[in-house]
Amino acid sequence: MQYPEPISKLIDSYMKLPGIGSKTATRLAFYTIDMQEDDVTEFAQSLISAKRDLSYCSICGNITESDPCMICADKSRDNSKVVVVEQPKDVMSLERMNEYHGLYHVLHGVLSPIEGKGPEDINIASLLRRLQKNEAIKEVIIATNATPEGEATAMYIARLVKPANIKVTRLAHGLAVGSDIEYADEMTLFKAIEGRQEI
């Protein structure tokens, strides 16, 4: 059956989101149509506002409303440590445990030859510039996910950073291989930070 064009466009829009296939997109489209008009308007405004009002911190690459972000601007944080993560959502996960008080650097991806992603496609160059510019940084804690791509990215960064006489550590693997930081509970993350190992 052919859907009316507005529904087809809505389904296509939902399918642009990661992890949303045609069945889920169709279900979301029909749910949206059944929503109250005020709720649809609020939903649309939230999308527009998030896209318009948020940007990336020029220092760490995290999502922010102001530049630098609140974490980079906070003088009470330990500026001798930088945790390197894949995505902004990983910063949120680590902040939720309220045990780590250093800084972050968001890569916005990992090295993935299969997907054609090399070092120039993620935020590695800005990390290296940051380390050269800020002599207070004494340790880089690599917190990429425990996936083959995350491991390859961690080893690549470690090779680049070690000559600068900066300690490079990796989260302990309280995290299961193949798991994402985003889904780990606070205690697992705390143990992983505490048990980090030099690489």
From Swiss-Prot:
Zn finger (C4-type) ranges are 57-72
Q: What does this protein do?
A: May play a role in DNA repair. It seems to be involved in an RecBC-independent recombinational process of DNA repair. It may act with RecF and RecO.
PANTHER family, per database record: RECOMBINATION PROTEIN RECR (PTHR30446:SF0)
Gene that produces this protein: recR
Please name the taxonomic classification of the source. Answer: Bacteria, Bacillati, Bacillota, Bacilli, Lactobacillales
Q: Which residues form the Toprim domain?
A: 80-176
Record's keyword terms, sorted: DNA damage, DNA recombination, DNA repair, Metal-binding, Zinc, Zinc-finger
Q: Which InterPro entries match?
A: DNA_Rcmb_RecR, Rcmb_RecR, Rcmb_RecR_Znf, TOPRIM_dom, TOPRIM_RecR
Instruction: Quote the protein name from its UniProt record.
Output: Recombination protein RecR
